[in-house]
């Protein structure tokens, strides 16, 4: 049976680190502050904003939610972001996705200052990933890296196969894995014989949004399997892209859903907020 990679345990450790850093900043008169912009009432976004607020409260980070109506003009959202960019008391800004269909997603996201972009969605920060420079990076691919490194799983020199090339996880994770000195193969919709490629992986990361698509016969014995997918299960709960039971019998280590990658995302938003303070000229 595979080692179960416990994302909740990793998240708890990072929360303690964040809390300690927040306390040190407050001793110097710096109170970390995160602004979250929620346009409309998407249920998942509302729930996520509440989980971020809870994480902020526990860590001692100030939290401000800007809940805007779905019909608000795009220019008004951009104007709000401009004000927050100029507000020195705001260290991190996050725009909840998805935005209403009538809005230009890219225009809104590019209106966030790169040094306050705690969700790592600005093109400048995406460029920093590619160039292996210091920036603010998206939290789900960060979670994939963190849960491996903090469980003593070596990435350097390993063959990593990524299934999925989405903007939020797959594409940034390609460069994050390269920056960890892995050899990376990317599989996607048009990849022929997916199972052939997945069976070559020392590390297999899956993020496609298709429940149970990776089964035990598609995994190399002893491989590390990181499931970054999230789907609605038949019983009404959530499940990942990996068929957990069959893969756990073959893999050397596996992250579950829930309890794996997703456990870290809100905590890493706070970690990015502290990093943003440093990028803005403060010291953490």
Swiss-Prot record:
Q: Which residue windows are coiled coil?
A: none
The record lists the catalysed reaction(s) as: (6R)-5,10-methylene-5,6,7,8-tetrahydrofolate + NADP(+) = (6R)-5,10-methenyltetrahydrofolate + NADPH; (6R)-5,10-methenyltetrahydrofolate + H2O = (6R)-10-formyltetrahydrofolate + H(+)
The EC number(s) this enzyme carries: 1.5.1.5, 3.5.4.9
GO BP, sorted A to Z: L-histidine biosynthetic process; methionine biosynthetic process; purine nucleotide biosynthetic process; tetrahydrofolate interconversion
Q: Which InterPro entries match?
A: Aminoacid_DH-like_N_sf, NAD(P)-bd_dom_sf, THF_DH/CycHdrlase, THF_DH/CycHdrlase_cat_dom, THF_DH/CycHdrlase_NAD-bd_dom
Q: A single GO molecular function, which one?
A: methylenetetrahydrofolate dehydrogenase (NADP+) activity
Named in its record, the pathway it takes part in is: One-carbon metabolism; tetrahydrofolate interconversion
Q: Write down the Pfam families for this protein, in alphabetical order.
A: THF_DHG_CYH, THF_DHG_CYH_C
Instruction: Give the CC-aspect GO terms.
Output: cytosol
Query: What exactly does this protein do?
Result: Catalyzes the oxidation of 5,10-methylenetetrahydrofolate to 5,10-methenyltetrahydrofolate and then the hydrolysis of 5,10-methenyltetrahydrofolate to 10-formyltetrahydrofolate.
Q: Self-association or partners: how does it assemble?
A: Homodimer.
Q: Which PANTHER family match?
A: C-1-TETRAHYDROFOLATE SYNTHASE, CYTOPLASMIC, C-1-TETRAHYDROFOLATE SYNTHASE, CYTOPLASMIC-RELATED
| Protein name as it appears in the record | Bifunctional protein FolD
